[in-house]
């Protein structure tokens, strides 16, 4: 079950008034850091930048591949466990703007988890330990430990251990 907070707007879409919800200076700083860091080849340096400058909780030996796009409004709501791999061009969102509502919530990715290339993780999602998410999957609901998720709409199978 996705977990998020919601703020509604009755007369305009929330992106039109987003800087009433999130400071412009914070978003500007986050965009510069995230866009620059997407192209850093060193996993150690990238991990350090994300932890120190964006307050993302990243476990030991976790790798964030080339061109991963992190949420620009609330990157501090992202947690990644130890020894996990976030694949090429993955998008991790902690917010979503609908026509009349702005939602935001934490994204938690467990340990020993693989997120395949071009996957998109929506806000408020918890992905367990030892999970495999196939390339291109839109993660729209929680995935339990030892799960294998694939497709859009997403399907989940359990991995036998």
Swiss-Prot record:
It comes from the Bacteria. Keywords: Acyltransferase, Repeat, Transferase. InterPro entries: Hexapep, Hexapep_transf_CS, Hexapeptide_acetyltransf, Trimer_LpxA-like_sf. Its EC number is 2.3.1.-. One of its GO terms (molecular function) is acyltransferase activity. It holds the Pfam family Hexapep_2. The keyword Methyltransferase does not apply. Belongs to the transferase hexapeptide repeat family. This is Putative acetyltransferase SACOL0827.
């Amino acid at each position: 079950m996705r977990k998020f907070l919601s703020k509604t707007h009755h007369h305009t879409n929330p992106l039109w008034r987003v800087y009433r919800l999130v400071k412009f200076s914070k978003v500007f700083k986050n965009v510069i850091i995230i866009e620059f860091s997407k192209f850093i080849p060193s996993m150690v340096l990238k991990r350090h930048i994300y932890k120190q400058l964006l307050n993302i909780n990243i476990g030991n030996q976790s790798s964030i591949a080339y061109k991963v796009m992190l949420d620009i409004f609330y990157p501090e709501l992202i947690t990644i466990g130890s020894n996990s791999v976030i694949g090429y061009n993955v998008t991790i969102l902690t917010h979503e703007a609908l026509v009349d509502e702005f939602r935001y919530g934490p994204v938690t990715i467990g340990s020993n988890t693989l997120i395949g290339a071009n996957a998109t993780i929506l806000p408020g999602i918890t992905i367990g330990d030892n999970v495999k998410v196939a390339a291109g999957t839109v993660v729209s609901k929680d995935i339990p430990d030892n799960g294998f998720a694939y497709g859009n709409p997403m399907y989940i199978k359990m991995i036998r251990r």
